[in-house]
């Protein structure tokens, strides 16, 4: 593939101008933007996420870069280093300032090995042991291409209701994908969150990946795990575990190793896992359509609503 000349020149300049872009190859898996593996004339390699069509929301690359930089401060956790980011801020005309991109360290991919799963547990435990004073984040960010509000609050059930579930429910209702009677069922659940999510309040804010599923686990060439595409904030650690279990999950060795080192409080499997997964199911309803509606309502029904 060949990058547009303006984009290639801007990247070469951002990297110091001493080397030229020799090759670019598409990398699969990009839902928000185009992705490519870059090779420079001095053999350095990088991962590029870019948007030429203006399809990605303004600020999305900046938000991801901030999450990756925060993950990079966690000892024992591997994530790609941020090399450069060029983005429009929210409210700016997307594309008005030229190409937008996120340039990252290239992490050579490999295959999972027996040590991958306990190592992933150790990495996630290190992340979750990075605690905050409140639930939320320094700025709003995104889940997929959808806005994610992170205004800080001290009460976890309120955060999950007002910053996560209610905005996605409102969007689904406005789009006609959830009807009024189904909305009432959600509202009855919301009234119970103070009691049902008390464990999150008790354990306090942990630094989260925020979108932890198998597609955002990158196994390195030696089998070590790295985390990519974060949507970070401070929340209840169980949110990451619940999301990881929503679409197949990781190897059971990962969960056993995590639970051995930091057991979950009672009520996770029966209640809190479903409440946390509801957020991601509503996100899928809003991103991909009513095909996820049935599973979303089934999860709500499993909670008694």
PLM features per residue range, with description:
Residues 1-23, 94-99, 284-305:
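Regulatory N- and C-terminal appendages and interdomain linkers associated
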Residues 26-158:
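ATP-binding pocket architecture of kinase catalytic cores
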Residues 18, 42-44, 224:
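Short acidic/polar mixed-charge low-complexity motifs
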Residues 3-15, 132-207:
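An alpha-helical support segment within catalytic cores of ATP-dependent transferases
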Residues 18, 75, 128-135, 172, ...:
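A general structural signal marking secondary-structure boundaries and capping sites
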Residues 15-22, 63-65, 198-200:
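Short Pro/Gly-enriched beta-strand edge/turn motifs at strand-loop
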